[in-house]
């Protein structure tokens, strides 16, 4: 179901949600961190979703063990490098990795700006080694409040040329986007693109707010847009993309089953929607699974899956020349 003549992208992929279970085990041993299990087989149920979680916040706790072993900036650099290696193994030509440095720094009080620098270094080295093209999206973790997000923003601004976009993720219901207007004003002043997690836990009003007040060019998840016809019209007309994450939305109980996922409806409505993983390490899936298993189960036809693949590049935070070069590179293979 993947068109090998087109670039394969993953533009909604959390770096800190893709820490290998084996790496968690190794870093735990290296830094003498007590883990809930001592073998890979027994650790996996603690760090991967085995059964669907009741809600988004419960799902997010599965990420915690991955960041608890980030006891040094070298560990952060390692997982960034491995994220690029994983992208290469998955056959991705282009990936946008998003990460929350405050979340990654929290367990061991690492310097937030140092985490940003370590991630940049690890990704740069990975791209050089594996030939994958990547850009970084900075996440502000709304769950930790406005001041913590301000600290993350300052760390990103210190490396503004290596950051492509700003995102807001975490507890959408408890910390609405309206709390972060000044943060996004500064992001736009820095010349960054804007993508926002919205319409995952909260309703369509959260998506409207992300677009109108935060300046979102893309929406992460956005499943609740299905409840507002005017919003779907607006998304299609303005070419505001929806970064769909099929398996993730089932695992967080945002959508009851794949057959009920709105991605097919979004594509039929002319919305620029793409297929992405979200937190592949925690979910136990990869982009190939999303295209070949999840998308057909969500009712997408072969042509709709191809359109979603095209949309992934069209939505990417690349300029027209970068997109053209990537298309030509893949077509020439």
Curated annotation (Swiss-Prot):
Zn(2+) binds at residues 12, 14, 197, 278. Binds 1 zinc ion per subunit. Its EC number is 3.5.4.4. PROSITE patterns: A_DEAMINASE. Keywords: Hydrolase, Metal-binding, Nucleotide metabolism, Zinc. GO terms for cellular component: cytosol. Substrate binds at residues 14, 16, 170, 279. Transmembrane segments: none annotated. It comes from the Bacteria. The record marks 221 as: Important for catalytic activity. GO terms for biological process: adenosine catabolic process; hypoxanthine salvage; inosine biosynthetic process; nucleotide metabolic process; purine ribonucleoside monophosphate biosynthetic process. GO terms for molecular function: 2'-deoxyadenosine deaminase activity; adenosine deaminase activity; zinc ion binding. It is an enzyme of class 3 (hydrolase). Its cofactor is Zn(2+). It catalyses: adenosine + H2O + H(+) = inosine + NH4(+); 2'-deoxyadenosine + H2O + H(+) = 2'-deoxyinosine + NH4(+). The active site is at residue 200. PANTHER family: ADENOSINE DEAMINASE. Belongs to the metallo-dependent hydrolases superfamily. Adenosine and AMP deaminases family. Adenosine deaminase subfamily. NCBIfam families: aden_deam, PRK09358.1-1. Catalyzes the hydrolytic deamination of adenosine and 2-deoxyadenosine. This is Adenosine deaminase. It comes from Escherichia coli O157:H7.
